[in-house]
Amino acid sequence: MVQDEVARRICSREGTADYGAITASINLVASSERILSVPRTMFFPAPNVDSAVVKIIFDRDKYPEVDKKIYRDTVRTAFLSRRKTLVNNLREWLKIDKQRAEDLLTKCNIDILARGETLSESDFVTLSLVIKAEFFSKI
């Protein structure tokens, strides 16, 4: 059981106001579902917030090909400045020019005007795999 606001964030979908880094991070290793709302009146003394029961089913091998650190960094970067496009956030993180950032997104079939909150779970997986291949595998 968690606060209602946390439950909304954990279980939200891309394109919604509640979708953020916590949602995308959980999606890498689990699936979540809101089971039950619990109003504040069910407690004594009543708290100032409502609660919800969330079911999280972990599957740490959901995406075995994904480097979890690079995925987390990709997600964190995408939501670093919500008002900025993904291109601008990637430019700052990877120290690349605008064209290279746009090419990176195009390679992943992601709109160059996209923001972090519009990316699906599979978009984040694809983007993190491409970033790893292009920036972190040249050792």
Where are these regions (language model features)?
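Class I S-adenosyl-L-methionine
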Residues: M1-G116, L129-I139
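Short, Lys/Arg-enriched alpha-helical microdomains
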Residues: F124
